[in-house]
């Protein structure tokens, strides 16, 4: 398994969905960064179940424990170890259907790759539960990149085919705080909630699109040719379970434009070189260009549904069917927002350190 990400700001994820805990070790955080457990907890609370409409009935406190690397509310420069204990575990449904591989899940591929020794309960290492560790690391990264003025904002841009109309950047956070699905378009938000409720009643699930923007990025983040800004972001974001696509700026839409329409013309704005449009999504040649970073992330429908689905029994090697009765989200898109934000912050922190923009000791 590959469980680490990053070069200088490096995270190592550990834990399983129904194991004792989930957590993360973060290496390379500069000393002197002011951070306390409450700041990390705020980010973790955004992704936990029960915070948004029709999330899994599995309720976890998700209280963070700091094992190392933070002393007197400052980072010490040592590895930071953060842990959340799993307390509300019910593996009975997974034991009942253990031999039946769940369509849309990693049960089959995990079984084949690890010879059946992998922890299958709740999806084990393949579960969205492990993203609690990603979000904890993202909270540290968010605080670190804030020292150079970078802000990262994610939101639900589309859910079940309902598309949000986006307000100005300054209004997004305020609107999201009033939405049950992290959508800045409050009219679309109500429609999304109703659609989630309908899908839940029908025993089905929904997917959608998360958008993430990064503001105030300096020019120069990204290490061509193999560690480009979009390459590192795509790798990190694809580590989120259920993500099936990532695009930047105009993305695949650029393939349908002429160069005269896709190119972003340069001009001088407040003594800075900027572009009058942003089809490149803030990245040119794999390097940040000073414009807002714009990422779109496709999230597939939750594969755990209560409708009967054809599958295979691994023990008997026969065709069978499966109805999933466990505790699952009808739509994970609203909860995925905080994870996409976290992975974006982690990559930006790593690349800012590699570029020498963030020092090894933070002086207040």
Swiss-Prot record:
It catalyses: 5-O-(1-carboxyvinyl)-3-phosphoshikimate = chorismate + phosphate. FMN binds at residues 125-127, 285, 300-304, 327. One of its GO terms (molecular function) is chorismate synthase activity. Its EC number is 4.2.3.5. One of its GO terms (biological process) is aromatic amino acid family biosynthetic process. It is an enzyme of class 4 (lyase). Coiled coil: none annotated. The keyword Amino-acid biosynthesis applies. Homotetramer. Belongs to the chorismate synthase family. This is Chorismate synthase. It comes from Dehalococcoides mccartyi (strain CBDB1).
